[in-house]
């Protein structure tokens, strides 16, 4: 009998407890989708049910058959070629008008046209969900516990608020970190934190700091003007809606939440209790940034092997390289080939729709990596300790290569002016100079030396939000302040008034005393 009980207990322990939840994914495109797809696969392994909203004109999302993965397809008034056109225009505009101190204004004007088209597509994607009452009713009945989105593709937050569920962001960057700074309330001191897309490092000269300061404020202005149209859309979508989202309040023995530097970790005893702490009065106008600021957790797709040290907030988690994995053995011959398998294909040859870059970088004979500077490719090179020759093209790629150059793991070649001699020289440099390989291996050791793997951290925080109905105890009070309170302008103004008043009174007293003593002196002389 005892043996049977022990055997039954062992079986129960092996089976484990199924705590599968329901996760909703807002649609996204390009590398944004590829990164979130990795997280989706891991959530499914942990027996969660995942539903992905898919516009009928989606370019990258391909529905597959999986009992734990549902693709909710809805109609939009455009096809795949529309999104493909927007992406193509974005790349070409950037290549033809790469921003520099002398071309930044023209770049802004040209990019504004592309972003306007992108916003039109995004609003049609939003309308396809928000104006589809049947779909919204179905989503409400599904009892989702969290929504995962990317702030580059708006409206996921609106859907989450309408469904009354918490939402999270997966984000690589925003230009000059404008979204993280103004919506997420992360401090970005321009004196030592380089603006994203500035191609600067944290070691800045006086001239660099001037350039960095201008870059921050210029890109803030661009964000304000290019994304302003979303404020009215958000107000209209959320207008008249009374929101009541479950949150958490926390009492910590170390006090209130505050920004931390990478070298600091918080250890604290928390006493948590559930509360209902957020209400949007009916009809009150809101903004895109205010709504984004309600995200429970921000999963930032970089890490300190890539980033320069800077302050961050407790609800920002760095998960760079979450897609990286050990290399698989490779065949003798790799062939990127689409179509019917050739009848004469040799046994030593394997066909691929897409060359397995990660496996190639992990091969022991790989000496260098020629890359355009995409974040995913750079992280695979870091993971396997491979030095790089960067040929950046657009978006964050020049900035990424600047980071790798500063860390001594890459050499850059200019796409517009390079020759075969330049490329060969760069390759010989990273292959023959030991410092590049040593620095690449140092970054690799840093990346691998983490207490929890990036993918596991990302999944943990999604499950954390599901378990606790949010993460309000990690939300800083900065979100509750007006802009002049946040910058302490009211306090500075009050102190200036006090100092000015004190100086005025002292001067008046001095003048009064001088006049008084002057009259007494004159009176004595007369006497």
Swiss-Prot record:
Topology feature Cytoplasmic, residues: 513-527
Topology with respect to the bilayer: Single-pass type I membrane protein; Single-pass membrane protein
GO biological process: bile acid metabolic process; response to symbiont; sensory perception of chemical stimulus; sensory perception of smell; xenobiotic metabolic process
Alphabetical list of InterPro entries matching this protein: UDP-glycosyltransferase, UDP_glucos_trans, UDP_glycos_trans_CS
Transmembrane residue ranges: 492-512
Residues carrying covalently attached carbohydrate according to the record: 49, 347
GO molecular function, one term: glucuronosyltransferase activity
Broad class of enzyme this protein falls into: transferase
PROSITE patterns in UniProt: UDPGT
Tissue expression pattern: Olfactory epithelium, brain and fetal lung. Not present in liver.
Signal peptide: 1-20
Keyword list, A-Z: Endoplasmic reticulum, Glycoprotein, Glycosyltransferase, Lipid metabolism, Membrane, Olfaction, Sensory transduction, Signal, Transferase, Transmembrane, Transmembrane helix
Superkingdom of the organism of origin: Eukaryota
A GO CC annotation given for this chain: endoplasmic reticulum membrane
Entry annotated with the keyword Lipoprotein: no
Note: UGT2A1 isoform is part of the UGT2A complex locus which displays alternative use of promoters and exons. The locus is defined by 2 alternative promoters giving rise to 2 functionally active polypeptides UGT2A1 and UGT2A2. Alternative splicing of exons results in additional isoforms for each protein class.
Purpose of the protein: UDP-glucuronosyltransferase (UGT) that catalyzes phase II biotransformation reactions in which lipophilic substrates are conjugated with glucuronic acid to increase the metabolite's water solubility, thereby facilitating excretion into either the urine or bile. Essential for the elimination and detoxification of drugs, xenobiotics and endogenous compounds. Catalyzes the glucuronidation of endogenous steroid hormones such as androgens (testosterone and epitestosterone) and estrogens (estradiol and epiestriol).
Family to which the UniProt record says this protein belongs: Belongs to the UDP-glycosyltransferase family.
Protein name, as recorded: UDP-glucuronosyltransferase 2A1
Organism (species): Homo sapiens (Human)
């Amino acid at each position: 009998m005892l043996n049977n009980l022990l055997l039954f207990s062992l079986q129960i322990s092996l089976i484990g407890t199924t705590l599968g939840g329901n996760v909703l994914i807002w649609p996204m495109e390009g590398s944004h989708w590829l990164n979130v797809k990795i997280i989706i696969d891991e959530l499914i392994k942990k027996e969660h049910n995942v539903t992905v909203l898919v516009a009928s004109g989606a370019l990258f999302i391909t529905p597959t058959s999986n009992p734990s993965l549902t693709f909710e397809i809805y109609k939009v008034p455009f096809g795949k070629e529309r999104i493909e056109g927007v992406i193509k225009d974005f790349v070409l505009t950037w290549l033809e008008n790469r921003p520099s101190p002398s071309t930044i204004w023209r770049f802004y004007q040209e990019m504004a046209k592309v972003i306007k088209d992108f916003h039109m597509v995004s609003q049609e994607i939003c309308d396809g969900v928000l104006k589809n009452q049947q779909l919204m009713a179905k989503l409400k009945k599904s009892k989702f516990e969290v929504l995962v989105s990317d702030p580059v593709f708006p409206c996921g937050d609106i859907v989450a608020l309408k469904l009354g569920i918490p939402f999270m962001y997966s984000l690589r960057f925003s230009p000059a970190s404008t979204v993280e700074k103004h919506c997420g309330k992360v401090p970005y001191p321009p004196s030592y934190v380089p603006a994203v897309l500035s191609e600067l490092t944290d070691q800045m000269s006086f001239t660099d700091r001037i350039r960095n300061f201008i870059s921050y404020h210029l890109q803030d202005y661009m964000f304000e003007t290019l994304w302003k149209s979303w404020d009215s859309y958000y107000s209209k979508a959320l207008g008249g809606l009374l929101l009541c989202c479950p949150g958490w309040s926390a009492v910590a023995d170390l006090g209130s939440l505050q920004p931390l530097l990478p070298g600091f970790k918080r250890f604290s005893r928390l006493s948590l209790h559930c509360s209902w702490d957020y209400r949007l009065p009916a009809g009150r106008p809101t903004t895109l940034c205010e709504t984004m600021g309600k995200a429970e957790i921000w999963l930032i797709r970089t890490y300190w092997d890539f980033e320069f040290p800077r302050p961050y907030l407790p609800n920002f988690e760095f998960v760079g390289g979450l897609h990286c994995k050990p290399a698989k053995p490779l065949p003798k011959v790799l062939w990127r080939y689409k179509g019917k398998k050739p009848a004469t294909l040799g046994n030593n040859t394997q066909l691929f729709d897409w060359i397995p870059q990660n496996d190639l970088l992990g091969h022991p004979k790989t000496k260098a990596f020629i890359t355009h500077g995409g974040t995913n490719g750079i992280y695979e090179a870091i993971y396997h300790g491979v030095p790089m020759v960067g040929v950046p093209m657009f978006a964050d790629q020049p900035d990424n290569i600047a980071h790798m150059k500063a860390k001594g793991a890459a050499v850059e070649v200019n796409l517009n002016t390079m020759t075969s001699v330049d490329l060969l020289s760069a390759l010989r440099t990273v292959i023959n100079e030991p410092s590049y390989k040593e620095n690449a291996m140092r970054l690799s050791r840093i990346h691998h030396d983490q207490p929890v793997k990036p993918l596991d951290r990302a999944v943990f925080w999604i499950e954390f939000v599901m378990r606790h109905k949010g993460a309000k105890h990690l939300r800083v009070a900065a979100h509750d302040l007006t802009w002049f309170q946040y910058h302490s302008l009211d306090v500075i103004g009050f102190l200036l008034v006090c100092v000015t008043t004190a100086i005025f009174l002292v001067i008046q007293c001095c003048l009064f005393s001088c006049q008084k003593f002057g009259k007494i002196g004159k009176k004595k002389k007369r006497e």
